[in-house]
Amino acid sequence: MSEKATEIANLLSPTVESLGLELLGVEYLPAPGGATLRLYIDVPLAEQPERVINVDDCERVSREVSAQLDVEDPISGNYTLEVSSPGVDRPLFTLEQFARHTGESAKIVLKLAQDGRRRFQGQILRIDAEAAAVVFAVDGKDVQIGYDNIDKARIVPDWVALGLAPQKPNKPGPKKPGHEKKKPSNESAAGKPRAE
């Protein structure tokens, strides 16, 4: 998260927790016409998977946070507040969140290039807490990426495991009588030979 997003997350986290929810992270996206402040919320880990985030949860957080932002005023200028569940392609904001998703695949965008690349996709292998880094399996190699160099990260859903993978098309079966393809004929519709 950016410094501004971290500042806002620290400010709003107690409010979200007071509603029995968890603030996973904040995206602050400044733009000329007005910024977007996006909050990702979830139910506490202990309550998953029995309980999931719903629209009512997002509305409650939006109301409470909106009131707090009006008083605290951490953002100058106009902005749009969005409150969202993380979805199946959830963003990852903290080392703890990377640890929760060990074994899953993630897409990562770096702040500074590493090995000539800024974008990686690989399986989260482990967290190196001492080095404050995440170790990924990328293209058959272990790649250690410093947490401070990660700009954005998202889980890549396993659509097959979720039962949402597109089905392969059925192989064509035998043709029904009367539905065979007609061979091009040298005759016109009237049965007369065509002039060539």
UniProtKB/Swiss-Prot annotation:
Region described as Disordered: spans on this chain: 164-196
Where found in the cell? Cytoplasm
The UniProt entry, under CDD domains, shows: YlxS_C (cd01734)
Entry keywords, A to Z: Cytoplasm, Ribosome biogenesis
Reading the lineage from the top rank, the first entry is Bacteria
Residue ranges with Basic residues bias: 173-182
Which GO CC annotations does the UniProt entry carry? cytosol
Entry-linked Pfam families: DUF150_C, RimP_N
Give a yes or no for keyword Kinase in this entry.
no
* GO terms of biological process kind: ribosomal small subunit assembly; translation
Q: What is its main location?
A: cytoplasm
Keyword Cytoplasm assigned: yes
What does this protein do, in the record's words?
Answer: Required for maturation of 30S ribosomal subunits.
Family (UniProt):
Belongs to the RimP family.
Instruction: Tell me the HAMAP family matching this sequence.
Output: RimP
Q: What is this protein called?
A: Ribosome maturation factor RimP
What organism, scientifically named, is this protein from?
Xanthomonas axonopodis pv. citri (strain 306)
